[in-house]
């Protein structure tokens, strides 16, 4: 179905810079996210008929409710999307709209960049559709403002068509998903549902309930700096220690060599001098045993290096970030079965595969609300080559409406 306000709503949202910032001491991590919630989303939520719309300054969540209009539809379903965008330029987003895409290259504004089907063969899936792209200078922000726009549009449709019967609906828009802390302060008591869905997936049909389990690893290397001319048997180069540590990790267990259910170690940052160096990693795996084994391995490498050095010069700090939500959701597959049924009725083929990443639903599921992930349409997310199909967004709205009407 076509929805008149969907495209304009999406364009309005992505033009607001809501980029999150790691290592911030505030929630949300940036003031722009709170401003987006309070000045744009909250008034709109109230205008389209959501009730009890309120913003929680402690956790940065904006929540609203649409009560059931049929008492026999007893389920309570939630829909969640995040307001922040990823670590890429998000200032002055200037979307361009490609009507009736017919294949070939798409020049991104006046930049020297282009979307080329040879580099991005996923473009070939969108012949004849309306695509929204960047101008080559920013990301687009479909992750996850497409999800916000889809939820808003579904609610607007339901309130404008009161004869359409639906269950109780809760809506939540939250901060800081991209930096991994968005759901840390989520309050289950303020979101009383049987289950929920994050509208945060990619192409048409995605339905996901398996995520990575994730940990952050910080390794500090303590060297000893002396003049290189007299360094023999005295200098300990912290940068060399960092290189040695990295080379002791399995070379093929890196993102660029893995897919499917394979986990990895990913070096995300390396800074330092001869005196001190610091390496930042993320650790990812699907199975609990292999996830734990990866953490044990880095501890063992550090212990072995320290033993060889005769003192503690390799310091490891490990922090779990989130866990594979499959462990929770597989205990009650109602949310998955309902979504599959709705998609199939809409002639959408469910694509059930693991998320090689995480969502807010990972943490929220472990808080007691099973929260799988549904497609929102974004492609090539987190950079200048990001795009989304309007038709896929429309289908996501169809799914949301189908879920609450079938509950």
Curated annotation (Swiss-Prot):
GO terms for cellular component: cytosol. Its EC number is 3.4.11.4. SUPFAM superfamilies: Bacterial exopeptidase dimerisation domain (SSF55031), Zn-dependent exopeptidases (SSF53187). GO terms for biological process: peptide catabolic process; proteolysis. The keyword Chloroplast does not apply. Zn(2+) 1 binds at residues 82, 143, 200. Keywords: Aminopeptidase, Cytoplasm, Hydrolase, Metal-binding, Metalloprotease, Protease, Zinc. It catalyses: Release of the N-terminal residue from a tripeptide. Binds 2 Zn(2+) ions per subunit. Its cofactor is Zn(2+). Belongs to the peptidase M20B family. This is Peptidase T.
């Amino acid at each position: 179905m076509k929805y008149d306000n969907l495209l304009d709503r999406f364009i309005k949202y992505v033009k607001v810079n809501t980029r999150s910032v790691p290592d911030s001491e505030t929630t949300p991590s940036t003031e722009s996210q709170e401003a987006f919630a309070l000045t744009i989303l909250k008034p709109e939520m109230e205008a389209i008929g959501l009730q009890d719309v309120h913003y929680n300054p402690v956790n940065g969540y904006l929540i609203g409710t649409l009560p059931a209009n049929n008492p026999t539809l007893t389920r309570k379903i939630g829909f969640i999307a995040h307001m922040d965008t990823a670590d890429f330029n998000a200032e002055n987003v200037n979307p361009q709209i490609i009507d009736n895409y017919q294949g070939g290259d798409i020049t991104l504004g006046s930049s020297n960049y282009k979307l080329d089907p040879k580099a991005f063969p996923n473009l070939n899936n969108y012949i004849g559709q309306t695509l929204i792209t960047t101008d080559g200078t920013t990301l687009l922000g479909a992750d996850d403002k497409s999800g916000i726009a889809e939820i808003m549009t579904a609610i607007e449709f339901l309130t404008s068509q009161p004869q359409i019967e639906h269950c109780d609906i809760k809506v939540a828009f939250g901060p800081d998903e991209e930096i991994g802390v968005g759901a840390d302060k989520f309050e289950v008591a303020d979101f009383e549902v049987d289950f929920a869905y994050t509208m945060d997936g990619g192409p048409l049909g995605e339905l996901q309930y398996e995520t990575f389990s994730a940990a952050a690893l910080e390794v500090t290397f303590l060297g000893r700096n002396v003049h290189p001319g007299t360094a023999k048997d005295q200098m300990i180069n912290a940068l060399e220690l960092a290189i040695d540590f990295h080379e002791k990790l399995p070379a093929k267990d890196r993102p660029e060599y893995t897919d499917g259910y394979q986990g990895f170690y990913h070096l995300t940052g390396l800074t330092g001098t001869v005196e001190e160096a610091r390496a930042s990693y993320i650790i990812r795996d699907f199975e609990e045993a292999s996830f734990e084994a990866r953490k044990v391995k880095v501890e063992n490498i550090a212990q072995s290096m320290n033993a060889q050095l005769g003192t503690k010069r390799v310091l490891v700090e490990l922090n779990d970030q989130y866990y594979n939500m499959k462990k929770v959701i597989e205990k009650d597959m109602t949310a998955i079965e309902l979504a599959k049924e709705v998609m199939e009725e809409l002639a959408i083929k469910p694509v059930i595969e693991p998320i090689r990443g995480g969502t807010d639903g990972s943490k929220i599921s472990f808080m007691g609300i099973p929260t799988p992930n549904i497609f929102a349409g974004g492609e090539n997310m987190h950079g200048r080559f990001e795009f989304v199909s309007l038709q896929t967004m429309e289908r996501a709205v169809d799914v949301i409406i189908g879920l609450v009407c079938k509950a």
